[in-house]
Amino acid sequence: MKPYQRQFIEFALSKQVLKFGEFTLKSGRKSPYFFNAGLFNTGRDLALLGRFYAEALVDSGIEFDLLFGPAYKGIPIATTTAVALAEHHDLDLPYCFNRKEAKDHGEGGNLVGSALQGRVMLVDDVITAGTAIRESMEIIQANGATLAGVLISLDRQERGRGEISAIQEVERDYNCKVISIITLKDLIAYLEEKPEMAEHLAAVKAYREEFGV
C-alpha cells in the first residue's frame, strides 16, 4: 500500500465516507463495511479528493487526453481531478461531462465542457453494476473517442451475480483497465495495522472469503 492510499483510507474514515459495522447493500448482501462518496461534500473535501484521484492517475501510468465525469456523481470528481492534475502535476488537461437531459436551447446537446475526443479517462466514485460505465461508453463511442481507462475511488473486489466482479465485466466488455485509489485488499492491509480494529478485520476477511474475486 502506498502512502497516498493509506492517507485516502484515513481521509474516508474521518469523513465517515468509510464505515465499518453491518450494512445491507442494494444487492441484499450484508456487508461489514460501507463506502458513501457523497459525504465528501465540502470545498476542502473535494480539493483533497481531487488530489487522491490525480495521484492514482499519475501512479497508473495510463496515457489519456481528457477526463470524463458521468452525471451526476462523476461531474465534481472530473472537475476536481482536472484542477489537481494542473496544480500538483503540471498536467493541464481538458474535462467534459454529460447531462442526463439534453438541452434544446443555448449550446444544446448533452455534453458540457471540452469536446469529447481522443483517449478518454472516465472518473467516477464506484462501480456497482457497471450501468453508468455502459451509458458513458455509448456517449464516448458516439463522439468518435476511445476509452483509455476508468478510475474509481474503491474497488470492492467482490463478485456480481456471476463469478466475476462488475469491474472485471467492464474490463472484459470494453477491453480497458479499471483502476482505483484503493481496493478491498488495501482496506484489509490497513485493518491489519490496527489492533484495535481486529473485530472489523475478521468480519471483512469473512466477507471476502464468501464474496471476493
Curated annotation (Swiss-Prot):
Asked if Magnesium is a keyword of the record, the answer is yes
Catalyzed chemical reaction(s): orotidine 5'-phosphate + diphosphate = orotate + 5-phospho-alpha-D-ribose 1-diphosphate
PROSITE patterns in UniProt: PUR_PYR_PR_TRANSFER
A GO molecular function assigned to this protein is: magnesium ion binding
Which pathway is this protein assigned to?
Pyrimidine metabolism; UMP biosynthesis via de novo pathway; UMP from orotate: step 1/2
Name any GO cellular component annotation: cytosol
Control of this protein's activity: Inhibited by sulfate and phosphate ions.
Q: Which GO terms describe its biological process?
A: 'de novo' pyrimidine nucleobase biosynthetic process; 'de novo' UMP biosynthetic process; pyrimidine nucleotide biosynthetic process; pyrimidine ribonucleoside biosynthetic process
- Name assigned to this protein: Orotate phosphoribosyltransferase
Q: Give the taxonomic lineage as stored in the record.
A: Bacteria, Pseudomonadati, Pseudomonadota, Gammaproteobacteria, Enterobacterales
